[in-house]
Amino acid sequence: MTAQGNIYGINGPIIYLKGDSGFQMNEMVYVGTGRLVGEVIELTSERTTIEVYEETTGLKPGEPVTGTGAPVSATLAPGILTSIFDGIERPLNAIQKESGCYIDRGIHADSLDTKKKWHAHMTVKKGDRLYPGA
């Protein structure tokens, strides 16, 4: 079950929720009715602090915040080498198709085409020891 809360305060890209709302540190969350992407950056018994990675203009106290149950992460795969992304790994070409030259708030786009097959040559096999920097 994912954690949920409501916005209590807003200060630029930082929003606050009252009390312990059940989120985890570094958890990716969706903020407001526009489902803006954010990350939990502080947890105390009094409040939860979240940094929103999109423009927060128009957000207001009382709007919902929904957790994903997973940390903010990036997809690593051969397909990302030929794409250009914004700061939260949304491919700019997919965003342009959806919103034109400007990035609308709350746009969600997969960072990788999951239908495409990627050919990879594995250089390790089961049981091999791996070392840092190798």
Which positions does each model-derived feature cover?
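Acidic-enriched and Gly/Ser
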Residues: 2-3, 9-11, 17-134
